Each structure stands twice: as C-alpha cells, then as structure tokens.
Amino acid sequence: MSIPIPGIKDISKLKFFYGFKYLWNPTVYNRIFDKLDLTKTYKHPQELKVLDLYPGVGVQSAIFYNKYCPKQYSLIEKRSSLYKFLNAKFEESPLQILKKDPYDWSTYSSLIDEERIFVPEVQPSDHINDKFLTVANVTGEGSEGLIMQWLSCIGNKNWLYRFGKVKMLLWMPSTTAKKLLARPSTHARSKCSVVREAFTDTKLIAISDANELKGFDSHCIEEWDPVIFSAADIWPTKGKPIALVEMDPIDFDFDVDNWDYVTRHLMILKRTPLNTVMDSLGHGGQQYFNSRITDKDLIKKCPIDLTNDEFIYLTKLFMEWPFKPDILMDFVDMYQTEHSG
C-alpha cells in the first residue's frame, strides 16, 4: 500500500518542533534518493529493516517506505506533539511508531534484546549490512555530543554497530556537518572530524543553503556534488541551514583505546607543534617522541594538521613507549577538545 505523505499545510499547524527542522518537500526527497542510489547497497529492499530516530513529521519515512517497501520500518519518537502527529497520519499504515527515546541507551536493549520488536540481522564486516539501515534527524541544538557518541560506537563496534557495518543517513545543522567533515589544517578541524575520518567514509549528500558550501573543502564538494535546496523546503524555515550526510563504517586496524587517548590529548592543544606538545601524553613524552619520529617535517606539524595515517603512526609509537602512562587512569573530558581552540 502507498502511504499518504504529510503536507506542509498540516505540518505548519504544529506548534512544537523542539528545536529540530525537517525537510518536507517530496520533490527534493526524490532528488536525494536518486543521488543516494540505495539499491546499490540494498539490492533486495523488501528484506531491509529501517530504524528511524527522531522522525519528526514523518515525510521522509513515508517517502522512503513508498519507494523501497522495506520489510520493517520503525519510527522512534517520544516527543509528545510529534508522536501524536505521526499516530494520526500513519495509524493504518505499515509504519511502526514506537514511543521511545532515541537518546536513551536502554531504548535499544529493550527494543532489540528484551521486547525483540526490532531485531536486525548480524552480518560480517566485509561489506555494508544490506538488511539494516539507520536514519536519524539531529538538527536540534546540542546534537554534536550525540553524534560523537554514535561515532565512538562505530569504533567500539557496539550499540547498533554490533550488527556489522550499518549505514546511517543523518540530518544535522550545517555548522555541525562542516565540523564533522573538516579536513586537516582547516579551521573547523577538531576531534569530531578526526574520529569521523578514522572510522567512517562520510559524504555530504544535501544542504539547504548554497552559501554554506564555502565552509567545506572545495575538492570534496566537487566530488560529492550535493543536492542544494531552499530554506523554504524545510519547516520551521527560520534558523540555521541543515545538511544530510551519508555515513558508512570502514575497516580500521589500530588499538582504539590507545588511539583515543593520543588523539584526545593532542587535539586539546591542536595548534601547538608536535615538537613541544608531546608531554601532554605523559611525563617524558617529548623526549621519547622526538627521538622516535624520524620525519622532521612531521615533528613540526600541529595536531590540527595531522592526517588519519599520522595519528595512527603516533599511536603505534605511543604503544611502544616503555614508560607510557596507564590510559585507564585518564579522566580528561572526551568533549573538552570540541570546545577548545
């Protein structure tokens, strides 16, 4: 059956959006789905299970279902006015609307392990899981910390990533997307983009303001060729632009705990050259790393300039350090770097 798509006339009557924004224009969604070409990954969409976090007004949910007819489509929405809206619009539809909190970790253990309402298939990590997709809208203020937690789960292979390499389609403020996709040596480079680069292949798919593209790497924009749409296509229309990114987990071969320790401490002092900052990893660190790093150009770099491979190289040296500190005794706030420099 085809699910009716909520229109802007009904959407605009809602009083509470809780600081989030939603694309409502079906024409723009068609352009986005054409660009994503999801059937390359999900060759048998009728076997696909989709978990939709913070679906809001459900326009994307309805369009996705009508286009791909997945086996199961579950919407996780606890916010009162939006939950009522979804129930009113999709009461007789195949969409499964669950009044649970996407922010609460216990939601997922309850959903998957206890109630077994939504049970994805575990697949090997040599490919993107072709029977499980996650989509989410975190366009509200303060979403960056939640995205960082999800990225950390990719590295630790827990949460939804215990089921393999699960693709995520993620709406966020364009300012967050710029920070997430920042390249080495750019002003927006932070621990957030370092983690993203280490654990995922992430692309900008769409954005609601062409002027925002100036904040991204020009070569990447040329490669990604994102869909550009208008602020008039989102509701509420006021406020910051939003962006959609596609996030695919990738293979990595390094010790995550030691890598996290090294990157976290170095990015706190991200504009200080390595030849003076290495004591931040532990007493005597500067002398040790100065003696081990043979590339004199690397030792002159600041953490903000380092590539993923260079961070991995420094982690390897750190693990070989006979007097390295006990990283389990480290209590540095993992988000401190996001608000520094």
From Swiss-Prot:
S-adenosyl-L-methionine binds at L23, E77, D101, N137. SUPFAM superfamilies: S-adenosyl-L-methionine-dependent methyltransferases (SSF53335). One of its GO terms (molecular function) is mitochondrial transcription factor activity. GO terms for biological process: methylation; transcription initiation at mitochondrial promoter. It is found in: Mitochondrion. Pfam families: RrnaAD (PF00398). Its EC number is 2.1.1.-. It comes from the Eukaryota. Belongs to the class I-like SAM-binding methyltransferase superfamily. rRNA adenine N(6)-methyltransferase family. Mitochondrial transcription factor that confers selective promoter recognition on the core subunit of the yeast mitochondrial RNA polymerase. Interacts with DNA in a non-specific manner. This is Mitochondrial transcription factor 1. It comes from Saccharomyces paradoxus (Yeast).
